[in-house]
Amino acid sequence: MVSVTTKILILGSTGSIGTQALEVIADNPDLFTLVGIAAGGSNPGLVIEQARAFNLRPHQVAVAGKQAAGEVGEALGGTVIDGPDAAQTLVESVQATDPADAVLNALVGSMGLGATLATLRSGAHLALANKESLVAGGEFVMAQARPGQIIPVDSEHSAMAQCLRSGTEGEVARIVLTASGGPFRGWTREQMWEVTPEQAAAHPTWSMGQMNTLNSATLINKGLELIEATLLFDTDADLIDVTVHPQSIIHSMITFRDGCTIAQASPPSMKLPIALAMNWPHRVPGAQPALDFTQAHTWTFEPVDDAAFPAVQLARDVAKQKGTFPAVYNAANEEAAAAFLAGRIRFPQIVDVVSEILQGASQFAGVSSDVDDILATESEARARANQLIDRLAR
């Protein structure tokens, strides 16, 4: 009997999620076959190494940076796809010739929107780690997807999807979204004025890329996840509780109408949700070590300090507004986060910028009928955010 593997296309192959996904594929050749990779171009040597390890041809590789693409192409003996839309172009090319069964979108930021939409149009399952593309695209993106086509990779949303298997849609009472609290849990806003980019890059329980780590420190990441949960599970923002769980063992919970709460627990590793998303709805044996319940464990939960970390409440308000308002939240944060990393503004000012841009967002945000509406809203939000950052940086 011939074994049929799931063909996987990975976008963002050199990042934290992408490299772990490749490890899962390499460890499970009986389950997965890699049919292409895309990367930004900051690490062309790693792209070359990945392509060679999986015997990829140049046409199966995309690199956004032109110079890096040239280096990769020369090493692989051909021309690779390049340019700012390289990932989207790769999706369209692969899906037209040797279609992937699932596309893992692990790109960073809303630049992943085009690739998300291209994947949905192709009919492939979308294993989504690029939460920003869903937040920015909102209801427009969800309208392009058939039921069950988007499989979350975020550990929290993967946990929700797993817990939801325990009941029916009408039985769900509340969703509980857990947060580690980040490196500054327990700090006051005043204390955080002196935070450096190096401090913000040190997450207590997770190993992630720079932007995700910073977003976790401000709790913007948890705000994005709250918005994402309302879209993925078609639920109201007020039915989602956010609780701080520093141990990062419980990845999220579902409370049902009979008073039962189902939780998903596992050590803090992304390999389990990555493997599950690529092989959904089936689990991958040995994806990661399980918890050892013969040892003592202490799990704690506490409320979010909204005074010190207002990003979650901002996101809740944005989720209720819907339309392109979530795109404003994300775009303003991307600009403010970059400004902080460049030393132009202080740590608490990241969320201050997001909040102020949202206050005037009704002038340019609203219902999105197409991608152009989303991109126009993002562009205006970025412009306004940078104007504000310029004033703050003086």
Curated annotation (Swiss-Prot):
Enzyme class: oxidoreductase
Source species, domain of life: Bacteria
Keyword line: Isoprene biosynthesis, Manganese, Metal-binding, NADP, Oxidoreductase
Pathway of action: Isoprenoid biosynthesis; isopentenyl diphosphate biosynthesis via DXP pathway; isopentenyl diphosphate from 1-deoxy-D-xylulose 5-phosphate: step 1/6
Cofactor: Mg(2+); Mn(2+)
Transmembrane regions: none
Catalyzed reactions per annotation: 2-C-methyl-D-erythritol 4-phosphate + NADP(+) = 1-deoxy-D-xylulose 5-phosphate + NADPH + H(+)
InterPro entries: DXP_reductoisomerase, DXP_reductoisomerase_C, DXP_reductoisomerase_N, DXPR_C, DXPR_C_sf, NAD(P)-bd_dom_sf
Chain positions recorded as Mn(2+) binding sites: 154, 156, 225
Protein role: Catalyzes the NADPH-dependent rearrangement and reduction of 1-deoxy-D-xylulose-5-phosphate (DXP) to 2-C-methyl-D-erythritol 4-phosphate (MEP).
Name listed for the protein in its UniProt record: 1-deoxy-D-xylulose 5-phosphate reductoisomerase
Species whose genome carries this gene: Corynebacterium efficiens (strain DSM 44549 / YS-314 / AJ 12310 / JCM 11189 / NBRC 100395)
